[in-house]
Curated annotation (Swiss-Prot):
Organism: Neisseria meningitidis serogroup C / serotype 2a (strain ATCC 700532 / DSM 15464 / FAM18)
UniProtKB keywords: Cytoplasm, Methyltransferase, rRNA processing, S-adenosyl-L-methionine, Transferase
Cellular localization per UniProt: Cytoplasm
CDD domains xrefs: RlmH-like
Record: residues binding S-adenosyl-L-methionine: L73, G104, L123, S124, S125, L126, T127, L128
GO molecular function: rRNA (pseudouridine-N3-)-methyltransferase activity
GO CC, any one term: cytoplasm
Oligomer and partners: Homodimer.
Protein name (record): Ribosomal RNA large subunit methyltransferase H
Enzyme class: transferase
HAMAP family, sorted: 23SrRNA_methyltr_H
Catalyzed reaction equations: pseudouridine(1915) in 23S rRNA + S-adenosyl-L-methionine = N(3)-methylpseudouridine(1915) in 23S rRNA + S-adenosyl-L-homocysteine + H(+)
EC id: 2.1.1.177
Amino acid sequence: MNITVLAVGTKMPRWVDEAVAEYAKRFGRDVAYVLKEIKPEKRGAGVNAAQGMAAEEKRILEAIPQGAFLVVLDERGKAPTSVELAEHLKTWQQNGEHVCFVIGGADGMTDRLKQQARMMMRLSSLTLPHGMVRVLLTEQLYRAASILHNHPYHRE
């Protein structure tokens, strides 16, 4: 199964990169996990939030793997339990889907991009730093995979 995470933002703290890499390597052979950073649009100097999100949208759309099942992370999305996320992962795997998760920039994502998504998901009702979202999403995807493999990582 292929999982791509597109994250607007670069230059994350080292602990973020290390944590994402740690969970990504735990997936094993049956999950190909890729994190792609999308360059954020600079704000100011005549570039407002809407213009910035539009520029980021273009970069995101260019980076989405062809035919991928698109999941955007958004505060208005559904918050699945770990077991529910595992069920989604199982379905995507059975359908041979390449799943692409999108983490928007500081101002979020355009409505047009959200409308293209086949699923809107949130990790929390709290506002989280972008680096933390990368780590939490990767950990939860690993947890979902471990649930499917009856690995003792997840406990009920």
